[in-house]
Regions:
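A cross-kingdom marker of C-terminal helix-rich interaction/assembly modules
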Residues: 1-118, 137-305
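Short, charge-rich amphipathic alpha-helical segments embedded
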Residues: 116, 123-139
Length: 305
């Protein structure tokens, strides 16, 4: 069926039912075009107002996609590939999609849904680190027929924290920094979870949002509106990918606990060059702007969270 065919069929139904009700038709046939125009206006405001985080996310997605492409060359169609390789392959691929969803939704002015995608991004990248840390966990993850049960048993907050702490310690991260990072992540996830499980406040702040171009004002956001709250969303997504670039990358190219790495560095390969150099670029950008605030008055009051 073509777009014109279903559009004609639907319009005729609207006209018929309004006619049967003895009322003038109120149907807006150009509503899809209206939404498209609305999205373009939001996108321009986001690009203008939500830097540096939007650009850093673009670079982060490019880095993540290159790393996935290297894994894809190794894993796709290879029956003998290890569970760790295959788990990293699928989890990084899904992470790329979630990161792209964060970007697209923020540009469209849909910050609430973007936060749900950012939460999924964090869960996938954290799970990937856990799989790279524990080969038995990776084997179980690949083979399980009850993914929900496996997740709650093996990748709950406490279990995941154990894996992340072990990896950070092995990489020489100071314990106090590890604690601070864990507390920050926990606080952000608690806020972002409000977009997944309905609450009155989260629903209200998805419906209406502080405008990116005038943060002292509130805008209707039911169809999307560039949001000042998206600063926090983009910031979290960028730092989540940065965290993986430090620790997940290390495990991919170095292995853990005496186990061999799942990738061997090829200094002449362009994609390998991209992920090695990009890892350092992302580190410099994120550390430079770690505490940068576009809307300090919003962040100080908890913005939309």
């Amino acid at each position: 069926m073509t777009y014109d065919e279903i559009r004609k069929e639907a319009r005729e139904l609207w006209l018929q039912f309004f006619r049967d009700a003895w009322r003038e038709c109120q149907y807006e046939a150009e509503f899809a075009e209206f939404i498209g125009t609305h999205e373009l206006k939001s996108e321009k405001k986001v690009v203008d107002k939500l830097q540096p985080w939007l650009h850093i996310l673009d670079d982060s997605i490019q880095w993540l996609a290159n790393l996935w492409a290297i894994l894809d060359r190794r894993a796709y169609g290879q029956q003998e590939a290890s569970s760790q390789l295959k788990c990293a392959w699928v989890l990084l691929g899904a992470s790329c999609a979630h990161a792209a969803a964060v970007r697209r939704l923020v540009l469209s002015g849909l910050d609430g849904p973007a936060r749900a995608a950012a939460r999924a991004l964090d869960e996938h990248l954290s799970a990937c680190i856990a799989m790279l840390h524990d080969d038995e966990l990776a084997a179980g993850f690949q083979a399980t027929e009850s993914p929900d049960e496996f997740w709650y048993r093996n990748l709950n907050t406490k279990a995941l924290k154990k894996h992340l702490n072990a990896v950070e310690s092995n990489c020489g991260l100071d314990a106090s920094i590890s604690t601070d990072m864990r507390e920050w992540r926990h606080g952000e996830l608690r806020t972002f979870s409000q977009t997944v499980h309905p609450s009155y406040l989260a629903a209200a702040l998805t419906m209406k949002t502080f405008a990116a171009d005038a943060p002292e004002t509130v805008a209707n956001a039911i169809l999307g509106s560039a949001s000042a709250a998206s600063e926090r969303t983009l910031d979290f997504a960028c730092k989540t990918i940065w965290y993986f670039s430090r620790f997940g990358f290390f495990l991919i190219y170095n292995g853990y606990g005496g186990r061999p790495a799942i990738l061997q560095l090829d200094k002449e390969d362009e994609m390998h060059q991209m992920v090695v150099v990009g890892r350092d670029v992302l580190s410099v950008l994120n550390r430079k702007y770690w505490e940068y605030e576009i809307y300090p008055e919003q962040n100080g009051s908890g913005d939309n969270g």
